[in-house]
Structure formats: structure tokens, C-alpha cells
């Protein structure tokens, strides 16, 4: 059985780590390289960097950041945001990222998942999905930092992404993002029934109990959190201790 992973998420905007609620009201919480090093030393299993302003203008800033992080952090880390081509992914992997996440660009061009998986291997390709529950109880996929409803059904998109060669799903509940009210267990379980690849749960972590709950009640292999770690509300060591006490295997 895969050991469960605790994964801090660093949303990066203009070279700084930021945090908001429901994808808005962003506040600056520090330098990405310092934050990565602190989390690595605190014992996290992996890191995720999402460049939320990623445009062609600041692509080099991101590559530079990845290089600095790779020099100081010796655990797997994923980079996402603005990855539009095989060449973009190649740059991030060469700079030292272990995995690269695609989101809006994969919706616009699903072939990108296949091309990247064929070139670098599925293990490098993470499909990040932002989803929200609709009035009819289905979930829709959102893009553009969670602002635009694609009208695409979440479960249909998960199935397609897996078939195209995704190696991992990073699933964010936009209803839960930043609320600290717990992960979206229903959505995770629905997705897990269709995806035989690792799933990272994101959106809603508010305390250690939520981190334990996601692993006890869903097949998620990783739990991603931002605010509770950035603001020191919960430590990684305490989270792992709580998980062990509940019989959850951690790294």
C-alpha cells in the first residue's frame, strides 16, 4: 500500500508565496525558497508550487525559482501554472522539478497529457483539476484560477485524463478552498472510483483531524494544505503523529 503523503502547497504570484480564500483576496506569506526549505526541514513528504500568475512574461522567474528550490530541497516537488507545451514541461523538469502539473492547458488541449506522458513518463505528469458542485449535484471543472466554468463534468474529465496518461490527479474542491471546514470527501470518493492512479486531495484542510479523516474515509494518497501550515496553526510533525496514532502509514 502506498504510504500517505503530507504536502504543503505554495501558491506563487510574482515570485512570492500567497494565500487567499476561494481563490481571491490574496495575501503575501513569504519567499518560496525559504518556505520550501522550512517545510523540507519540518519533514513534509512532497511540495507543490502553483504559479498562479504564470504567463509567458514570468516564465523565467518560475524556472529560476525551481532551480533554487531544487538546490535546497531533497524531496519530490511538483510545479504547475502556465504549462502549455511539452517544451514548458521540459524546462521545469530540467530545472529540477520531479513532476509538472497541467490544468487549463490540458482542458484546452487534452493531447498535451498524452504528449508529455509519452515523452517524460506518466510519473511526471500531474493533472490538476479545480472543481465545484453544481445545482444538479454534479461537479464541473473550472479554469482560469477557478473563475471560469468549462461546463465539463468532473468525472468524465478524470476518466479521459487517466486514459491519456496522467500519472496523478491533484483534485481541488473550490467549494472548500480556504474554508478550513474539511476536505470534500464525496467528491474524492467519486473520483477515486474512476482513477486507479494516486489522488492528492486539496481544499478545506483546517486541522489535523481533517488530515486523518481524508485518509480514513477516502483512498486519497496525499493531502495538500496551505493556510494551516503557512500560518503555523498545525505542524507537519504533529500531523504525522496523529496519523500514526490512527494506524495510517506515513513516510
Curated annotation (Swiss-Prot):
Catalytic activity: 5-[(5-phospho-1-deoxy-D-ribulos-1-ylimino)methylamino]-1-(5-phospho-beta-D-ribosyl)imidazole-4-carboxamide + L-glutamine = D-erythro-1-(imidazol-4-yl)glycerol 3-phosphate + 5-amino-1-(5-phospho-beta-D-ribosyl)imidazole-4-carboxamide + L-glutamate + H(+)
Location(s) in or outside the cell: Cytoplasm
Molecular function GO labels: imidazoleglycerol-phosphate synthase activity; lyase activity
Enzyme's top EC category: lyase
Pathway: Amino-acid biosynthesis; L-histidine biosynthesis; L-histidine from 5-phospho-alpha-D-ribose 1-diphosphate: step 5/9
Residue stretches spanning the membrane: none
Primary subcellular site in the record, as a coarse category: cytoplasm
Assigned keywords, A-Z: Amino-acid biosynthesis, Cytoplasm, Histidine biosynthesis, Lyase
GO cellular component term, pick one: cytoplasm
GO biological processes: L-histidine biosynthetic process
Pfam families referenced in this protein's UniProt entry, alphabetically: His_biosynth
Record: active site: 11, 130
Functional summary from the UniProt entry: IGPS catalyzes the conversion of PRFAR and glutamine to IGP, AICAR and glutamate. The HisF subunit catalyzes the cyclization activity that produces IGP and AICAR from PRFAR using the ammonia provided by the HisH subunit.
NCBIfam families from the UniProt entry: hisF
Description of how the protein assembles with itself and partners: Heterodimer of HisH and HisF.
UniProt family annotation: Belongs to the HisA/HisF family.
PANTHER family hit by this protein: IMIDAZOLE GLYCEROL PHOSPHATE SYNTHASE HISHF, IMIDAZOLE GLYCEROL PHOSPHATE SYNTHASE SUBUNIT HISF/H IGP SYNTHASE SUBUNIT HISF/H
This protein's name: Imidazole glycerol phosphate synthase subunit HisF
Species of origin: Streptococcus mutans serotype c (strain ATCC 700610 / UA159)
Classification lineage: Bacteria, Bacillati, Bacillota, Bacilli, Lactobacillales
